[in-house]
């Protein structure tokens, strides 16, 4: 925005310090071969409407999430090729993983109604390569599968369960007279430590960090959790497939995000968020040994999310990324600043 450029705000500083050319729409868009829209979903319609008036013929429009196309139903000029590169993590983690020489798992897709030259997939591959995702894994998906699986993953295992489990596990430990500071650190950093094993060996490796008796206990607990939550997960999936979930979310956008901000405030006011800081280091294995319930929750949530998505017709690539592969990167945000950070960056 011109106003941001004139004021040289933080986004301007970030861009210029990283050697990006900064200018307004009218100066940059008409000459661009590829225009990437990374604005929040609620801003997409206005942004894309403006972009289409300025984009040159036969150019490419890129999304990192297909909500605007699938749920809002945005119509794009037929000469514009529409592609998607959807890193399976918050945007902050895309940058951090790239800086350390790696990347994040990514889904790529082409909007079939906007691929007039049949070159969309090659451009999407090149874009995903440029952010380092080829080092972590790039799978071809579709706009619909990415959106439906993304919404399902975030509402269940990725955000919903991590948030609810953090609050409930903390309250249980406090009720049992454990040190509040230790309990908070065990949970806050425990998700990150435990899910790191998912990156390298999935649920099997995570479970292998436990003793045999603890494995059996975690397995039994996870099976109980799955039975309790199966109908709830299926209801979430039904609401997402039908479009009801997205419809309610867009209504909240028009109401200045009242529900979202109220929920975010409720989370910020929980005892877990306000817990004292534990200064001492917790050994890595201790997170596993004292986190059997957390491991059971992760196992149940991953399996149930994946199974529910597959049973609803979502392709396995999208279901896998949204149930397991993105989980460690979401856990990273909790480790930094607990649940409020996760809610803000998602």
From Swiss-Prot:
Q: Which SUPFAM superfamilies match?
A: 6-phosphogluconate dehydrogenase C-terminal domain-like, NAD(P)-binding Rossmann-fold domains
Active-site residues, Swiss-Prot/TrEMBL = 65
Q: Which GO terms describe its biological process?
A: isoleucine biosynthetic process; L-valine biosynthetic process
* Residues that coordinate or bind Mg(2+) 1: 150, 154
Where along this sequence does the record place binding of Mg(2+) 2?
A: 150, 322, 326
UniProt keyword list: Amino-acid biosynthesis, Branched-chain amino acid biosynthesis, Magnesium, Metal-binding, NADP, Oxidoreductase, Repeat
Keyword Ubl conjugation applies: no
Kindly list the positions annotated as binding NADP(+).
Answer: 11, 41-43, 91
Q: In what residue span(s) does the KARI C-terminal knotted domain sit?
A: 142-286, 287-346
The Swiss-Prot or TrEMBL record lists the needed cofactor(s) as: Mg(2+)
Enzyme Commission number(s) from the entry? 1.1.1.86
Name this polypeptide is given: Ketol-acid reductoisomerase (NADP(+))
Give the organism's phylogenetic lineage.
Answer: Bacteria, Pseudomonadati, Pseudomonadota, Gammaproteobacteria, Enterobacterales
């Amino acid at each position: 925005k011109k106003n941001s450029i004139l004021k040289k705000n933080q986004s301007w500083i970030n861009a210029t310090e990283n050697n990006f050319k900064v200018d307004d729409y009218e100066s940059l868009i008409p000459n661009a071969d590829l225009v990437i829209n990374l604005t929040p979903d609620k801003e997409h319609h206005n942004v894309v409407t403006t972009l289409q008036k300025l984009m040159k013929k036969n150019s490419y429009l890129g999304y990192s999430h297909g909500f605007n196309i699938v749920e809002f139903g945005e119509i794009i000029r037929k000469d514009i090729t529409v592609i998607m590169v959807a890193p399976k993590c918050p945007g902050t983690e895309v940058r951090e993983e790239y800086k350390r020489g790696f990347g994040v798992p990514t889904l790529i897709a082409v909007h079939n109604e906007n691929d007039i030259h049949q070159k969309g997939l090659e451009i999407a591959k090149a874009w995903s390569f440029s952010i380092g995702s080829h080092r972590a894994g790039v799978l071809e998906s579709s706009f619909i599968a990415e959106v439906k699986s993304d919404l399902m993953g975030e509402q269940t295992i990725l955000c919903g369960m991590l948030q609810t489990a953090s609050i409930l596990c903390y309250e249980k430990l406090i009720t049992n007279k454990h040190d509040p500071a230790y309990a908070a650190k065990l949970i806050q950093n425990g998700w990150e430590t435990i899910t790191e094993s998912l990156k390298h060996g999935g649920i099997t490796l995570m479970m292998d960090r436990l003793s045999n008796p603890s494995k059996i206990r975690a397995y039994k607990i996870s099976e109980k959790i799955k039975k309790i939550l199966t109908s709830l997960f299926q209801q979430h999936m039904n609401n997402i497939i039908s479009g009801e979930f997205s419809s309610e979310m867009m209504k909240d956008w028009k109401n200045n995000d009242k529900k979202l901000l109220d929920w975010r405030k409720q989370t910020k006011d929980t005892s877990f968020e306000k817990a004292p800081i534990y200064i001492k280091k917790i050994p890595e294995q201790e997170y596993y040994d004292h986190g059997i319930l957390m491991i059971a929750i992760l196992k149940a949530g991953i399996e149930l999310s994946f199974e529910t998505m597959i049973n609803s017709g979502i392709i396995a690539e999208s279901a896998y990324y949204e149930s397991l592969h993105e989980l460690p990167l979401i856990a990273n945000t909790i480790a930094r600043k607990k649940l409020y950070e996760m809610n803000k960056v998602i």
